[in-house]
Amino acid sequence: MHQPLTRTRQLTMFGIATAAAVALSACGGGSSFDEEPGASGDPSEDAGGTAALDILIASSGDAETAAVTEAADAWAAETGNTVEIVVAQDIAQQLSQGFAGGNPPDVFYLDAARFADYAANGSLEPYADQIEDFEDFYEPLRQTFTFEETAYCVPKDFSTLALEIRTDSWEAAGLTDADIPTTWDELADVAQTLTTGEQTGLVIGDTRDRIGAFMVQAGGWVIGDDGTTVTADSPENAEALAYLKGLLEAGSLKYPSQVDSGWGGEAFGTGKAAMTIEGNWIRGAMTNDYPDVDYMAVELPEGPAGKGTLQFTQCWGIAADSDATEQAISLVQYLTEVDQQLAAAEAFGVMPSRESASAGYLEQFPDDAAFVAGGEYGQGPVNAPGMESVLLDFDTGLQQLASGDPAQILGTLQSNAEAVIGQ
């Protein structure tokens, strides 16, 4: 069922300057470590020793750095090991250099969009099956970090997309809770109703990281579940792009650049957009930069195939060449326990990747219900190696969707993806 409407003046979690990065950078950690060592029967029981673990993270700010450091130090104190936390300035570059130089960190943040590249070249230790209660992680997140039928690593946390609506614009248009859009047709109707001379009904990012949600709602995606079949030019994807093209032509949908904004959250906060589609990271940006704006967060409307959203996540990667694999697995087990994930949520606002932690999270952040719901049905990034340049080219096509041909845009994606994946 569609989540009920909520109004919120959100608590501070993330600044607008890091809003884009926050969707892809978060950790499991916190300040409450009440369990006795090994109390849950997890791998930490057998991790005693004197291993020195290097941990590379991409932090969203001081709160995240402090949380992951405190959690790792607590594990080290319990097990007799040592840890060194390195906060990367550019984690993609530093991780690549570490592997290329034969000196990767033992444990590290690994973005879902880059996971397949590292899994394919043998850089990762496939440890996921050694984590207790692995099935407790949301199934779509587990699939995101599965390559060639092997689950490699466990997600630290995750974000999803939802529909944000300004309550002042909603009420000024005479709309009520009964008008919350639950279908594409209803979204088109309210977007048109909310479009005025100075405000666009809906403003969303002009890349696959927002538009892709509509492809999922139509029953499509770039590749099939097997990770090897390219499905870009499917009728379902064409239907999604045609729908959005219609809204762009009607003027009820615009991209941020069309309203002199850097991203959807800025257009939303300044009132240039009545609605936007962003992740739960928007909460901090709104609080920090637009504290007087009341808004609602609801699940994305269903498409022809039903519900659909996108998931953004990172896993705790472990280097295949680590000399302390056993201890690294123990650390990851510790960091991803329910109490640690809830402590991380309290410290800097990330959503737990374990289903059993969702109730506790919603007690802290009830207004995030729409985002949490996406954990059950969200779509992760394209899970195939070598696709980054192909997807960037797809983004370029999407940016020209208003004047472009959906079939041509998808056809180009199909041929480019097949060339990489080897179809």
Locations of regions flagged by a protein language model:
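Hinge/lid segment of periplasmic solute-binding proteins
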Residues: A112-A162, T196, F214, D292, ...
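Conserved C-terminal helix/tail region of periplasmic/extracytoplasmic solute-binding proteins
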Residues: H2-Q3, E171-A172, D177, E376-Q423
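A structural signal for short loop-to-beta-strand junctions that line the ligand-binding cleft
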Residues: P105-D106, F134-W170, G201, G306-K307, ...
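Long, aromatic- and glycine/proline-rich binding clefts that accommodate carbohydrate-like moieties
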Residues: A345-D393
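Extracytoplasmic/periplasmic substrate-binding proteins
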Residues: A58, L241-A324
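Short, solvent-exposed loop/beta-turn-alpha elements that line the ligand-binding surface or hinge
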Residues: G49, E125-F137, I180-T182, L202, ...
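Extracytoplasmic "Venus flytrap"/periplasmic binding protein-like
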Residues: A71-E139, A172-G174, A274-M275
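Helix-loop-helix "hinge/cap" segment bordering the ligand-binding cleft or interdomain interface
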Residues: T146-R210, W221-Q258, A320-E326, D405-Q408
